[in-house]
């Protein structure tokens, strides 16, 4: 996610990130050590219009049963803590009941609940966040128990859903904010308990309209991608620390199906976070401006959003993101996002009356660039935190083929994957800001203010909940 603590850990270290290249070994065994979950979409009922476009109004989430209470939390590779809302928070107990869809946690019902500290505090760039306690309890993951598992509860919160952060332990809020020692978060705890062999997982979000995706801790599903996986290094700070899942984006281009040629936008490599917790993608301002101009998007600076006609969902142009060698090709049907009506039934329109949709790429400003769901849905990704690398392949949308392989240990490559030779190993975190070069589009095509001006920096999303593979879910058991 675009969190303050996440950005702090990067920007205070250096203006450049560096990388080393290693790899992971994936083998198929009779009894593989894999913990997996299907990702299911859900829609928050009757959300306020600003919440539809807010960062965490809904999203890719896992469903968790906390003492027979179902709680949803965002799956987030851009942060590292699991935190959930409590039933006694002022935000969740307000008259509007904003946490009703996501659920809340009542610690008084657990006999194994233990307080660790009162130091939990996390905030995000959009102004949301949570604070409260670090605690331990028993967590059941797909029938596997993790005793004395540490997570956080938000007594104070401004987000209707909690977050399941699965990034580096160094990205935990108590580390980045206070310099305290880290604790084993979910993937690290699964390794420590011997349930998976490596701190690595694969992510298949599937397309925008699909009802299901998949996350596998300790595993890869070769039936969910096309061709070969290609592996690039995660970038580290000048001090050698790995704090975030950031790689080098080396180019962006646009291709039409009719012409076939790739028109690349001139740009230097830039560090981008591969962040499943961000619904939109955020690129350097100058690069965003070039993309907007190429598709005649209309930029609204009051919302930091670009709008396009909703009919562009049928456009045959595709954006191509290159990472030294592997590419993610994204169709307009993944980038054109319909906000739907607001609480008063008004829809975003241009002044000529045509319906306006949000374009799924926004300017990053002075923050780190992020590739969120609008781009990541078109890729199959393997995040290897033990060896500090990410493997990428084109996704196979709506695939029903399953071939799950276990991620082992060591420095051998993944099945059907190769390390990218001479991959870019350093890139600036931020670029110069300013969108003065953006065209306003055709005359009279700027969105109207009624129903079309979001009040918060957006991450437009449709809700996603994760149920366990073969029916197993993430279950918190309190005894």
Swiss-Prot record:
Protein name, per record: Probable aspartic-type endopeptidase OPSB
Gene encoding the protein: OPSB
Lipidation feature positions (GPI-anchor amidated glycine): 451
Disordered: region residues: 435-454
Signal peptide: 1-19
Compartments (UniProt record): Cell membrane
Annotated GO CC locations: plasma membrane; side of membrane
Residue ranges the record assigns to the propeptide: 452-479
Recorded topology in the membrane: Lipid-anchor; GPI-anchor
UniProt GO BP: proteolysis
Principal subcellular localisation of the protein: membrane
Glycosylation sites: 68, 121, 398
EC number, as in UniProt: 3.4.23.-
Described purpose of this protein according to its UniProt entry: Probable GPI-anchored aspartic-type endopeptidase which contributes to virulence.
